[in-house]
Amino acid sequence: MDNEDKISISAKEEKILSFWKEQDIFQKTLDNREGCPTFSFYDGPPFATGLPHYGHLLAGTIKDVVCRYASMDGHYVPRRFGWDCHGVPVEYEVEKSLGLTEPGAIERFGVANFNEECRKIVFRYADEWKYFVDRIGRWVDFSATWRTMDLSFMESVWWVFRSLYDQGLVYEGTKVVPFSTKLGTPLSNFEAGQNYKEVDDPSVVVKFALQDNQGFLLAWTTTPWTLVSNMALAVHPELTYVRIKDKESGDEYILGQESLPRWFPDRESYEWIGQLSGKSLVGQSYEPLFPYFQDKKELGAFRILPADFIEESEGTGIVHMAPAFGEADFFACQEHNVPLVCPVDNQGCYTAEVKDFVGEYIKSADKGIARRLKNENKLFYQGTVRHRYPFCWRTDSPLIYKAVNSWFVAVEKVKSKMLKANESIHWTPGHIKQGRFGKWLEGARDWAISRNRYWGTPIPIWRSDDGELLVIGSIQELEALSGQKIVDLHRHFIDEIEINQNGKSFRRIPYVFDCWFDSGAMPYAQNHYPFERAEETEACFPADFIAEGLDQTRGWFYTLTVIAAALFDQPAFKNVIVNGIILAEDGNKMSKRLNNYPSPKMIMDAYGADALRLYLLNSVVVKAEDLRFSDKGVESVLKQVLLPLSNALAFYKTYAELYGFDPKETDNIELAEIDRWILSSLYSLLGKTRESMSQYDLHAAVNPFVDFIEDLTNWYIRRSRRRFWDAEDSADRRAAFSTLYEVLVVFSKVIAPFIPFISEDMYQQLRGETDPESVHLCDFPHVVLEKILPNLERKMQDIREIVALGHSLRKEHKLKVRQPLQNVYIVGSQERMEALAQVGSLIGEELNVKDVHFCSETPEYVTTLIKPNFRTLGKKVGNRLPEIQRALAGLPQEQIQAFMHKGQMVVSLGEETISLDKEDITVSWASAEGFVARSSASFVAVLDCQLTEPLIMEGIARELVNKINTMRRNGKLHVSDRIAIRLHAPVIVQEAFALHKEYICEETLTTSVSVIDYKEGEEWDINGHAVSFVLERVER
């Protein structure tokens, strides 16, 4: 494709964008459906602090397709755009730009100053977002956007929280939760699950000395930094443990029996002392590894506890427990009254209690801790292990699990409601419902919603010194309690508000909400529910449709479900499409640093937004699978789908204008069989599109487009070309024009939701004066059942299967399509052969064969050979396969032909018989000299390849036509221009030209031919003969 084509595509789409904008087409689509049933849609809010990428364009395209379709199908579809404004993504950008990276830097800078800086950059890339949203062809309402930082939105978030609190679903507690030391705040479980990486971590086995010199307990860990906080060890009471003596050191060790070979692979290296049960170890005491918390022994620390979660598949069967840094450790120690110590600050550094490592980052301390243990003879093994480890989804730093005081939503209390809500949601793809999302719901944990951050919606809890709480659910309530006018709900506006009530002073707790709480509340907060637009909000709840990426099964889809199930015992949405991840072509994550992908703007400038949309929609990424993005794939869509469609339109326009066809004058037209076929194919496609869209299956909706465009351009138009060229105003020509007009108009509406630019271009070139102004203002077409003719479609499918089979034979045996052959034999069932007998001439034309013979038996020129399909039959018959092979080799042709018809046969192996079907047999053919054969699913084709002199001469004539018409196109001649030819060629080519002069002149609009004896003009190879032409346009 040349640069001119690329420029014209981009320019044409820009022109259509201008048309939509100038004529306010999007608003007219809304006005057009005012009063119709509402199709409600929630748009997952992006952050405008980063530029949009292919993932955003993909999700935006999916949303746009569904909303456009719903609008054309008779629904009012409001499409408000929303912005996620709060949280770490914004804070992190400000911290970096202002250099506020040290602990306490934000407080010194001032929370008010910091939050106002956050407010300033929230819409840093809003213009770029609007550009890309528009350029991809997506329609959204930017004039009515909602923002999570707006006062109205934040007030509704408070209402949601207060409602949860009133239902007893909010509590304060200390739990071990995922913690980002880079951010200094806890994260939710679903945030922790979003960014796992394969990493190499330390792997150490530590020697814990039992009291009174009774040997050592061996415990394995990948987090040596937690060993300074060890408070207990745990064993499984039902497992068997062993005591052995290491011959080299003389030390006695206790570990799980099943793990013994892992750590002592050499049986000669130790002396067996005996077995003991886990239960017998419970309650025993051991010496602390480090001196920092020895005083906790009096409070119950440094004991062996029972724990039934221990497995021996890895480790030693004995688990080291640091209750501040492991959820299972925390609960086990809590149950047995073991004290908790947490000598790690919010930046992940040791506090003063660990005097030897104070101020050191915990992950950096791993080596020093292992070194110290080794020096003190407390280290049994040191190595590394590769495993999956969670990283902060925003800062890409390693997470830890840390006991913190936090506020929680009691998700586990409403788990049954969430599972019930999920049952009524239609998921695409369907496996996510009970798979990734359903399993996540089943394992749902209480949600830590408080964050030690600044730029977010403050948690509306005021607490008195004696612990009494006031939970505020509205601005009016806060104003009434505080006596102050509230103009903003961010921290720096309300942190200093003190409420005095009943002789007590209440101050707000110093936390903001997890920003996922904001987005989970958007169905209500976007409309300031319940303070405004309550009826509208309730009427549109649950949403008819949402769509986002696979990661949102543990993000937005989840938080929406938590809040909707808890507050309303309903799902938040009825239908959801989940897309996969777009990777770079090399399979890696797209990276600006690595420059491993082309920019979206470059792709749309080069190939157009429609090509990008269709490439994405027709890929596995809309089925929640990963896609390796390829610009060649986008280019292929343009070349193989969109340009042929444009060419079909250009063909119609050219000849309709040439002959003055008026689509309104189509009464009493008798359609040809090929007309009825393409219309039947069109309305069958329409039915499939409607069915697929009802199931939100965009891949299934789009996939048939490609085949239909092939049917239209490479079969219907090509086969009907002469009908359009008919100089007389015949009924057949009018039928062809009428059919092609109907197909193009209806198809432009079918594809409008998916590829909105080319559909608009088609429609604008076809629409009449009284038709709607835009294709997107049209109703989506309905199926016309009487035009669907399944038998005719099946018949045409058979014809095309035979033609494809014949062409594959020609290609395989290097027989040019333009070289005529004398005979082709088509073998199939009697019923099908009889149905196809009337179209022999059509097949002959397509295959360039003079005589087409339909047979129910393989002709004498071919012998059918069969042998076992070793892959499938080997599983069925095992070692009897050689016997079957011999039996098949001896079968007569009559039996083989019977098998070819029935698809089954019975083979006798002595007294036993075995039934075989088509999948058990491999078929091939041995052809007589001059013949070649091949089969498809339904037919066998046998080509007679023998060339006679007349066939050779006709082949030369056809090559001449092809080359002359190529020169016409290259010379930019109009389709109706007449030409004169000067020809230099050898005698055989001159003879072929003379013999087929009428055919050649008619096909090329040639009025005169003169043979010259010198080379002139462009030179061509015509079946091995050097020929040159000069073409000149002739005035009529």
Curated annotation (Swiss-Prot):
Disulfide bonds: none annotated. ATP binds at K592. GO terms for molecular function: aminoacyl-tRNA deacylase activity; ATP binding; isoleucine-tRNA ligase activity; tRNA binding; zinc ion binding. Its cofactor is Zn(2+). Gene3D superfamilies: HUPs (3.40.50.620), Isoleucyl-tRNA Synthetase, Domain 1 (1.10.730.10). It is found in: Cytoplasm. Its EC number is 6.1.1.5. PROSITE patterns: AA_TRNA_LIGASE_I. One of its GO terms (biological process) is isoleucyl-tRNA aminoacylation. Its main location: cytoplasm. Pfam families: Anticodon_1, DUF5915, tRNA-synt_1. It is an enzyme of class 6 (ligase). The keyword Translocase does not apply. It catalyses: tRNA(Ile) + L-isoleucine + ATP = L-isoleucyl-tRNA(Ile) + AMP + diphosphate. Transmembrane segments: none annotated. A motif ('KMSKS' region) lies at residues 589-593. One of its GO terms (cellular component) is cytoplasm. IleRS has two distinct active sites: one for aminoacylation and one for editing. The misactivated valine is translocated from the active site to the editing site, which sterically excludes the correctly activated isoleucine. The single editing site contains two valyl binding pockets, one specific for each substrate (Val-AMP or Val-tRNA(Ile)). Catalyzes the attachment of isoleucine to tRNA(Ile). As IleRS can inadvertently accommodate and process structurally similar amino acids such as valine, to avoid such errors it has two additional distinct tRNA(Ile)-dependent editing activities. One activity is designated as 'pretransfer' editing and involves the hydrolysis of activated Val-AMP. The other activity is designated 'posttransfer' editing and involves deacylation of mischarged Val-tRNA(Ile). Monomer. NCBIfam families: ileS. Belongs to the class-I aminoacyl-tRNA synthetase family. IleS type 2 subfamily. This is Isoleucine--tRNA ligase. It comes from Chlamydia trachomatis serovar L2b (strain UCH-1/proctitis).
